Amino acid sequence: SVSDSVQVSQAPDSMSVSASTPALEVLRSGLLTTFQDDGRVAANMGVTGSGAADRTSSHLANALVGNPANTPVLEITGGGVRMRAIGSVVVAVTGASADVTITGSRQSQDSQGGSNGTFTPNSPGGCSGRTVLNASNDAADRTTIAMQQPVLLRDGDVLSIAPPTSGLRDYVAVRGGFGVATTLGSAATDTMSGIGPRPIAAKQRLAIRTASTACDAGVGLPQPWPTDLPKPGRPTDLYVRLGPRDDWFTAAGLSAFLTQTWTVTAQSNRVGLRLSGAAPVERTDTRELASEATPSGAIEVPTSGQPVIFLRDQPVTGGYPVIAVLEPESLDVAGQLPPGACVRFHVVSAHATSTPQPAYPTKEVR
């Protein structure tokens, strides 16, 4: 395995949880929940970068609770997660659009902070003012909260994240960060090689580090959605730069790649998205290709002619020609594509030019 070849020493997944350590106790772990950050730099050891599939959303979650951007977060694929707060915890949920609720004695807690819907710092105890922004009570002990905002969970509160209505992955950041060990400089779980912490399971207690400053310092305000989330029934536009092996394909093959709508198949995960289309991408060069480096966002075309988009857990090398590479912002969007989603590719032109361009959709980079 990769971990054997580089002799990686796996540290314990997280710091121990004492009675006085704030934590999140996992009641339901969902389809796949992992620790992620910005990933590791270890390609020279044959190890992929890994990290958050939607880095924009993970950075936003950390910003909302006042953490550095690279602080480990929880990446939740497909929702269905429930976690109980042990002690007071400031959290933020970003990413895929989903119903997020808090169950606990919220009405009496909210009354301490007034009724103007604002987060009140510097109240007695440091963070004991208004606990929820833009919340609505739909039951005596259940509160529905808007995403993309800091929220205070009190001891015993249960945070629930439902399956997404658009997008695929949600991110949970906690003020101070999770007390998770790093491997090769990162706390990211690499699902292909097994490097990093194991996927989160029910009954785990996830320790939370103490924030270095007062809990209200640097906590952000509610933010708009950072990316255009994939929506059912509407094709998602992904922007690419052609190459380095686009010359291995026929003109008809390039046209098929760029003009038809592709569907994300169920054989997709954090490693990559397998696509299906009516017209396969035809190759003009049928030789075997020596293994080459494959970055996240590379789009390989195997002999079937059905493209594969590599995501964050991609292999460091691949043996099929790469027809194009996603732009960084499109890589984050691709990380939110669920099975069944439809995508279209658009070529990015680096500069405006009078030279005739291919008759494909383009986006000019300024």
Where do the PLM segments sit?
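Conserved "landmark" site that anchors the functional core of diverse proteins
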Residues: S1-R366
